[in-house]
Structure formats: C-alpha cells, structure tokens
Amino acid sequence: NCPGCFMGAIPDAIKIYEKYKDEGVRVLGLATAFEDFDKNNLDNLKMLVETGEVVGETKSALSQYGQLQEGSKLSFKIPFPIGMDNLTKSAGEITQEKILEFIYPQIPEFDSQPEEYRNQIIQRVKDHMKSKEYSAETFENFSLQGTPSAILVDRKGILRDVSFGQTGHIDGMIQQLLNED
C-alpha cells in the first residue's frame, strides 16, 4: 500500500534485476507496514504476488494514472522474490530510554536544544509509541524513514547503503561494487 513504491521504486528494482541478474546481483522485495495494517498485510501481499492485484492508496493512485489492468491489477509482473516484514504487536512499557533511543538517531543535537523543545519532542514520540499497533522489524532495525526505501548489501554481507525515496543512485553503486570484486 505504497503508491510511490509501485510507480517508481518497484519498476526501478525490476530494471536493476533485469540488468544485473546474470552478474550475481540479487533483488529482494520486502513489504512492510507502519500504518494501514488492514491493507499492509500478508493476505494482500500474497494476492499481489499471485494475481498482481493491488489495494488501498496504491490502487487509487495507479488507477488515477491509468496504470492498472482489469481495474485493480498491475500492468507488470514482479520477477524477484518478495517477503513480508516481521510485524510484532507493540507491547511493553514506554520508557524514557526507549523514547531517547528513538530520538537520538533522528535529532543528534537533541541534548543541546531548549528544554521546552525537548519536552515537546519527547511527548510527541511518546504519543507516537502509544499509538503504534505493530512494530515492523526490518523497518525499525534499519531506521527506515518511510517507503520506498532501499537497502544495499555487498557480496560479503556488508551493509553499503540505506536510502529513502529515489533509488536512482543504486545502479551506480552496484556497478562500483561489481568492479570491487
């Protein structure tokens, strides 16, 4: 349920897959959920993989741009494996430590901010954590900012890039990594 994924990132990933599949590059798709849990779920992912059918905002956006067939189906097949992020029911106490662990990567200079600002941010994060129904393991472990996102791992299993939004730079990075070997 990510219009930007289906209009840009997935077609870009398909191009990368087609271009580099014979050079040992592997492309994997990962569906995640940080909202709209009624639509971002395993059943709808299976339906997408098996039939090409999309739902929710993706269906609305692609339909608006005339990019669907038979009303709700993609005009292309996704040729690489797709999995679902591990979603766990949010539970546990929201501690000051958890709140700060969330804040510091986003606002490194947090401690030097005025007290009123810090208190506002802490309250917003606390409210956000209280409202979270599920946690998406990969999404959170890689501190992804949203979708679409790309994670690039080299042949040795070393994380080389995590990016949000446009993925145009990935092709050049893959070329560079292939030349390293």
Regions found by a protein language model. Name each.
Residues 7-103, 108-110, 134-135:
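Structural microenvironment flanking redox-active thiols in thiol-disulfide oxidoreductases
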Residues 1, 86, 154-157:
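Short, flexible loop/turn elements at secondary-structure junctions
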Residues 102-181:
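Thiol-/selenol-based redox modules, centered on thioredoxin-like
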Residues 4-5, 126:
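Short, surface-exposed alpha-helical recognition segments that flank or form part
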Residues 1-2, 9, 34, 146:
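Short pre-active-site segment immediately N-terminal to redox-active cysteine/selenocysteine motifs
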